[in-house]
């Protein structure tokens, strides 16, 4: 049995989907354990581009059981759209399952998300306005609606009527918005429930049964360490726990059953939306990285902020997630720059540190300490082994391993999943 977890080590968009898709080939089951459709995986397989926001990337591998775990919040309309688009491209969703414990994103969640962000004004946190945060808030408040409720029509109607009494008051009286039509919400969502009923199951039992049978299971992370509600750059974070520990609560799997944890990173750093970014290059270098790496959000289309790779962050991510391996992307991209910088420490009040601070005020006082490397402006897209990489690339990658203290096992040298070096 092998149970692997794949997590992002930065602010998301590291290219996790590519490695999840690759590792899924050796897995019997792929499980998504956190987040919602505010995250997106883009995979290019056999020349076809797939953008997935809820369904596990493993769906592209025939015969794999793909599970949306209880830690995920589900927008039924988005999920049904993804199912339809996959089916139209010849991809079967017969082996897709959704946890009966997963919470449902309702129209009032999306409306409140938008109204709250508008209310914050210049203090906005850059939410995607897809209702993720308000849905998780209801989950914590114990007023949420779960998939088991969505497919139980009487229970669903009761809960919606109860919730809308409060939600419509908040929408109207606090934010000055227009209240939602109760009957329209009920009618729309009952239809979603009927269409999704065949996919809803007690997936926790199914996962545990697979573990007992010695099956290979891949746990697919969305977003990343520095967007984690507890360990990220709070409050510029998501509303869930995308770190490896999120598997335990988001899929109902005890830590003793986790064998390997892969941390995915880019050879540089990017971020969407507001929040701190110590190595950001708000200049021609940042613009060049953005264009070379085509750094625009899968979900929002927003241009990403770009900068140098920050190993203080990666080392912190290695500790928080218990990483056993690194998987690095865009090695081909960063090498096109003549000079490359690598942040190996921070300097604060004249003192060097390799610890990532909790306080954003303290983080703002930290200056990156850089080491400089020469680029390798040559085509490496067909390189199949570490030894065949340019010397400058090998120096760069070896320094990353040395400082982080975790071996690089997968190296991305292009967009296709075949353009990956597996390091033994």
UniProtKB/Swiss-Prot annotation:
Reactions accelerated catalytically: IMP + L-aspartate + GTP = N(6)-(1,2-dicarboxyethyl)-AMP + GDP + phosphate + 2 H(+)
Sites where the protein binds substrate: 298-304
Pfam families from the UniProt entry: Adenylsucc_synt (PF00709)
Residues that, per the record, bind IMP: 13-16, 38-41, 128, 142, 223, 238, 302
Pathway named in the protein's UniProt entry: Purine metabolism; AMP biosynthesis via de novo pathway; AMP from IMP: step 1/2
Family in the record: Belongs to the adenylosuccinate synthetase family.
Subunit structure: Homodimer.
Name the UniProt record assigns to this protein: Adenylosuccinate synthetase
Gene: purA
């Amino acid at each position: 049995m092998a149970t692997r977890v794949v997590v992002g080590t930065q602010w998301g968009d590291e290219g996790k989907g590519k490695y999840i898709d690759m590792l899924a080939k050796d897995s019997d089951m792929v499980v998504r354990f956190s987040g919602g459709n505010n995250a997106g995986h883009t995979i290019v397989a056999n020349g076809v581009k797939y953008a997935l926001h809820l369904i596990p990337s493993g769906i592209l591998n025939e015969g794999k059981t793909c599970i949306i775990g209880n830690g995920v919040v589900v927008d039924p309309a988005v999920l049904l759209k993804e199912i339809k688009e996959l089916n139209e491209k010849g991809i079967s969703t017969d082996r897709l399952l959704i946890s009966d414990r997963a919470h449902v994103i309702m129209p009032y969640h999306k409306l409140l998300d938008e109204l709250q962000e508008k209310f914050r004004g210049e203090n906005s946190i850059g939410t995607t306005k897809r209702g993720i945060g308000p849905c998780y808030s209801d989950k914590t408040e114990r007023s949420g609606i779960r998939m088991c409720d969505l497919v139980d029509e009487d229970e669903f109607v009761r809960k919606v009527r109860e919730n809308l009494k409060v939600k419509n008051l908040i929408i109207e009286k606090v934010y000055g918005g227009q209240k939602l039509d109760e009957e329209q919400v009920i009618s729309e969502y009952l239809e979603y429930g009927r269409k999704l009923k065949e996919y809803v199951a007690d997936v926790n039992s199914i996962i545990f049964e697979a573990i007992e049978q010695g099956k290979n299971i891949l746990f697919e992370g969305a977003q990343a360490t520095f967007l984690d509600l507890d360990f990220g750059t709070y409050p510029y974070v998501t509303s869930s726990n995308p770190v490896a520990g999120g598997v335990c609560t988001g899929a109902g799997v005890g830590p003793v059953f986790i064998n390997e944890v892969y941390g995915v990173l880019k050879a540089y750093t990017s971020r969407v939306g507001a929040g701190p970014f110590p190595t950001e290059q708000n200049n021609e270098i940042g613009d060049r990285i953005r264009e070379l790496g085509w750094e625009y959000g899968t979900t929002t289309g927003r241009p990403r902020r770009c900068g140098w790779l920050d190993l203080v962050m990666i080392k912190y991510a290695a500790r928080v997630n218990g990483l056993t391996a690194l998987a690095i992307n865009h090695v081909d991209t960063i090498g096109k720059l003549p000079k490359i910088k690598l942040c190996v420490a921070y300097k604060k009040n004249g003192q060097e540190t390799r610890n990532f601070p909790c306080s954003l005020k303290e983080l703002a006082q930290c200056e990156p300490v850089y080491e400089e490397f020469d680029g390798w402006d040559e085509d490496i897209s067909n390189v199949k082994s570490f030894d065949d990489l340019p010397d400058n690339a090998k120096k760069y990658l070896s320094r990353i391993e040395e400082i982080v203290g975790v071996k690089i096992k997968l190296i991305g040298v292009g967009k296709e999943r075949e353009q990956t070096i597996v390091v033994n």
